[in-house]
Each structure stands twice: as C-alpha cells, then as structure tokens.
C-alpha cells in the first residue's frame, strides 16, 4: 500500500492520479475534508481507503500497524502563505510531519514530503543550501524548519555510522494545474485569470507584474519527479521547479491565447503582501540532475495550454 497525505489536495490528488496511471491503486488517502469541495479531486481516482487526518495521526502516534507500506507521500499541510497563526502552522506543518517521519524511519518506509521554495525568501540564488534560505512568512518558516530537522537526522546518522531509510523533500516552486479549484485565493494565477475571462472580464495582474518572475511548474511534472524518486529510492532535499523564471505576464498571455480574447489589466499591489512576497524565484536544478532525475519540464506556454484544455474541456 502507498499512503498519500493531503491526497484530496491539488498535488496529492495528482500524485494519486499518476500512481493510478502506472497501475497502482492500493492507496490510502489521508486528508481533512472539512472543505467538502475537495472531494471532487477524488471522484475519478481509484483508491483503497480514505482516512481523516486526525484519526490517521492518532493511529500513527499510537504506532498502529497499517500493513505493508511501500511509500508515504506526505503532501498534507496548511499551504496558505497568507496564514500568520504561527502556532497552528507549526503544529500542522512541523510537529505532525515529525511524527509521521519517525513512524516511517522506524519501519524503513520511504518518506517523500512536500517542502517549498518559500524557504528561500528574497535570495536570488535558489540552491538547496542553508546559506540561501530565509523564509518571508510563517508557512515558509515551517517548511524551512522541517528541512533543517531532516538535515540534523542525516548528520546524526552519519556521525554514528548509520544509514537512514529514504527521506526525500521537494521544494515546490509555483505549481499550477488541474485539481486546484478548492484552494480559493491560494490557487494559481492561471486559475484566477481563467475564471476572470470566463466571467467576461479582462485578466488582472498586480501592478509591476512584468517585473515579477517566478518558476512556474506544471503539476503533472511535479508528479513525474515524485514518482521518479519513489522508483529510484534517492534521499535528499531537491528543488522541484523548471529551472526557468517566467513573468506573470507570460501566464496571462497563455490564458488569453487559449480563449482568444482578453487584455491584461493592472490592479494595485496589495498592502498586506508587501515585504512578504517573493518577486523572483528560479530553481537551481544542479542537485536534481546530479541525482539522476531526467524529467523534462513544460514551460508556461505548454503547461498552461494543457491546463486550460483540461479545465475548459
């Protein structure tokens, strides 16, 4: 069996779909369906079982046996970069992750987890090294702290001549694609621009967006990276982006091209995001490629075109 936490979320449900596509359906999805709309992400997927996050954590902390587990994809987290309740964020993204990690280490279960490019903050260098990290929000800090916890475990193991079972963290950059409709304001720019055009409006970008460049990665490519590491058993913390930064304007142009209408409008940059907003991200893929991962990534034009074809079917 494979366990996917956050399995009803955007990345989690796409990982389940990718597993289904290679013939794997013995999957336990763990999530919190308080936001009931997320169920739609599971409707067309083939899974063995579903478990509420709190019930799952209770069983994990009790050391319960789930039977043979081939791997755990830990995608479950509070991913709202605008959430400032640090106690809530650290409990969800740090403490719970440690519990699950140790459960997996004790049983030598491969543990593949979601980190984030939010760990980098304002740097212009995006290498998986401590000197370039400095989160701008509490979400990024929770991910940064868990990465550092994992690093300490590796260091301790090395000092004692031990080898840990697989732990692989993925620093997701700006992920977009199908199954994000439940995310509200946290959904991708492509999602919001598409909805604006469908509503008969022009697509709207923040003033200065031509200067803001991000590494936008299509969710299908994120899944390919996850599956490659599951199949190859490589440990480490790796960037999961395309290696190229493109502007928000490029995203808007790709959405406009799909619809054949619309002109970009600018709106004022929100006060609450000033000082807590990454204006530039671009994954350094040196470490990913050195590990042997040869997944090729779609650019914005290609990825958004595929996304629009799916959601506007």
Curated annotation (Swiss-Prot):
Species whose genome carries this gene: Vibrio vulnificus (strain YJ016)
Chain positions recorded as substrate binding sites: 174, 185, 192, 206-209, 214, 277
Entry protein name: ADP-L-glycero-D-manno-heptose-6-epimerase
Top-rank taxon, per record: Bacteria
Primary role: Catalyzes the interconversion between ADP-D-glycero-beta-D-manno-heptose and ADP-L-glycero-beta-D-manno-heptose via an epimerization at carbon 6 of the heptose.
Domain remark text: Contains a large N-terminal NADP-binding domain, and a smaller C-terminal substrate-binding domain.
GO process terms (BP): ADP-L-glycero-beta-D-manno-heptose biosynthetic process; lipopolysaccharide core region biosynthetic process
UniProt similarity note: Belongs to the NAD(P)-dependent epimerase/dehydratase family. HldD subfamily.
Enzymatic reactions: ADP-D-glycero-beta-D-manno-heptose = ADP-L-glycero-beta-D-manno-heptose
Cofactor binding summary note: Binds 1 NADP(+) per subunit.
Recorded GO MF terms: ADP-glyceromanno-heptose 6-epimerase activity; NADP binding
EC number: 5.1.3.20
Gene3D superfamilies referenced in this protein's UniProt entry, alphabetically: NAD(P)-binding Rossmann-like Domain, UDP-galactose 4-epimerase, domain 1
This protein's pathway: Nucleotide-sugar biosynthesis; ADP-L-glycero-beta-D-manno-heptose biosynthesis; ADP-L-glycero-beta-D-manno-heptose from D-glycero-beta-D-manno-heptose 7-phosphate: step 4/4; Bacterial outer membrane biogenesis; LPS core biosynthesis
InterPro entries attached to this UniProt entry: Epimerase_deHydtase, Heptose_epim, NAD(P)-bd_dom_sf
Enzyme class: isomerase
Listed Pfam families: Epimerase
Record keywords: Carbohydrate metabolism, Isomerase, NADP
Residues engaged in binding NADP(+): 10-11, 31-32, 38, 53, 75-79, 92, 143, 175, 183
Entry cofactors: NADP(+)
Self-association state and partner proteins as the record states: Homopentamer.
């Amino acid at each position: 069996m494979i366990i996917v936490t956050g399995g009803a979320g955007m990345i989690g449900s796409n990982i389940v779909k990718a597993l289904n596509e290679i013939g794997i359906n013995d999957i336990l999805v763990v999530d919190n369906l308080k936001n009931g709309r997320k169920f739609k992400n599971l409707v067309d997927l083939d899974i063995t079982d579903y478990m509420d996050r709190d019930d799952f954590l209770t069983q994990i902390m009790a050391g319960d046996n789930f039977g043979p587990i081939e791997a755990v994809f830990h995608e479950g987290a509070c991913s709202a970069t605008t959430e400032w309740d640090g106690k809530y964020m650290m409990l969800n993204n740090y403490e719970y992750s440690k519990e699950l990690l140790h459960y997996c280490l004790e049983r030598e279960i491969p543990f593949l987890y979601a980190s984030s490019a939010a760990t980098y903050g304002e740097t212009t260098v995006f290498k998986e090294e401590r000197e370039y990290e400095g989160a701008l929000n509490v979400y990024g800090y929770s991910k940064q702290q868990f990465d550092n916890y994992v690093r300490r475990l590796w260091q301790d193991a090395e000092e004692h001549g031990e080898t840990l079972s697989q732990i692989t963290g993925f620093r997701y950059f700006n992920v977009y694609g199908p199954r994000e409709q439940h995310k509200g304001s946290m959904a991708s720019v492509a999602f919001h621009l598409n909805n604006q055009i469908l509503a008969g409006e022009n697509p709207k970008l923040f003033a200065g967006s031509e200067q803001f460049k991000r590494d936008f990665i299509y969710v299908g490519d994120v899944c390919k990276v996850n599956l490659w590491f599951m199949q190859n058993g490589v440990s480490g913390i790796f960037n999961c982006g395309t290696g190229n930064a493109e502007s928000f304007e490029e995203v808007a142009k790709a959405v406009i091209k799909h619809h054949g209408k619309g002109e970009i409008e600018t709106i004022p940059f929100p006060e609450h995001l000033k000082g807590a907003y990454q204006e530039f991200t671009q994954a350094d893929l040196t470490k990913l490629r050195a590990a042997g991962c040869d997944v090729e990534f779609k650019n914005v034009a290609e990825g958004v075109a595929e996304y629009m074809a799916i959601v506007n079917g």
